[in-house]
């Protein structure tokens, strides 16, 4: 009898994170089903199994529940596994034990060391450094040399939703001004929890030079652009894997891999520098 697994999502981005896990489960002869407590179920493929009630989950009787979310229902059958929903961007509570999980599948050595140190103290969960499943198919796609910069260049503008770290409102007027000039093309996308007022403001900027994207998998946008502008979003760490430049506004953890600015007046100049 095939082993059952449950993939648990609370946002649409769970699909991009957990589909590689589903592929691995199927390759080993197992069966995966999905359960959502938020958006995402509507984007499942015909060959993907959806459970919609806790009774169905109990009958499925998974040996493991895997999620990128920070919490999971403790009464679902199976070992609880967290794969994370992004790289560490330097925000508070990235390393935070909530008592939901039996296993943390960490993305790299830094997280592994910190989680193992806690595991040694509390003793109620395990840690295995697995890498991040969302990146697996993407790394195969970006192999090879960087393509030349488009003319005009295309910029991906992405912001986190956290009010303390988001630069969306601060840079709105500059994005508005620059998107009307035509020097560059823009694709704008936000974290799904971004304020709907902010989303509406940027969506209203759409014109021949700017497109607002609702893609649930931001990785699909990376091949379409030449650089990223962001703030303290974990998505910029994903983008850096492409070796394309990133301009940030008041990043919490700046470094030589970023062109970090602290004044909207520097935005256009930093963007030109990144593209040069």
PLM features per residue range, with description:
Residues 31-46, 181-214:
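Catalytic donor nucleotide-activated moiety binding site of glycosyltransferases and closely related
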Residues 33, 65, 81-82, 103-105, ...:
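Hydrophobic/aromatic beta-strand patches that form the interior of the parallel beta-sheet core
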Residues 75-84, 215-258:
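A donor-sugar binding/catalytic signature common to diverse glycosyltransferases
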Residues 121-129, 205, 234-276:
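Catalytic binding pocket for nucleotide-activated donors in carbohydrate/polymer assembly enzymes
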């Amino acid at each position: 009898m095939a082993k059952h697994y449950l993939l648990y999502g609370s946002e649409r981005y769970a699909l991009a994170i957990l589909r590689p896990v589903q592929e691995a489960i199927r390759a080993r002869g197992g069966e995966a089903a999905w359960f959502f407590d938020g958006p995402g179920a509507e984007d499942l493929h015909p060959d993907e199994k959806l459970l919609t009630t806790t009774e169905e989950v109990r009958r499925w009787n998974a040996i493991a529940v895997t999620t990128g979310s920070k919490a999971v229902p403790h009464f679902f059958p199976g070992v609880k596994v967290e794969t994370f929903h992004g790289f560490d961007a330097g925000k508070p509570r990235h390393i935070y034990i909530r008592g939901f999980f039996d296993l943390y599948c960490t993305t790299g050595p830094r997280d592994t060391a910190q989680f193992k140190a806690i595991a040694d103290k509390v003793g109620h969960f395990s840690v295995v450094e697995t890498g991040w499943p969302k990146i697996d198919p993407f790394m195969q796609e970006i192999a090879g040399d960087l393509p030349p910069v488009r003319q005009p260049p295309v910029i991906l503008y992405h912001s986190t939703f956290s009010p303390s770290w988001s630069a969306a409102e601060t840079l709105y007027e500059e994005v508005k001004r620059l998107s009307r000039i035509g020097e560059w093309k823009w694709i704008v996308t936000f974290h799904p929890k971004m304020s709907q007022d902010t989303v509406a403001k940027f969506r209203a900027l759409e014109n021949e030079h700017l497109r607002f994207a609702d893609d649930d998998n931001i990785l699909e946008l990376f091949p379409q652009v030449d650089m990223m502008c962001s703030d303290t979003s974990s998505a910029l760490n994903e983008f850096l894997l492409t070796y394309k430049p990133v301009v940030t506004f008041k990043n919490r953890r700046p470094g030589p891999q970023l062109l970090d600015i602290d004044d909207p007046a520097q935005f256009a100049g930093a963007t030109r520098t990144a593209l040069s």
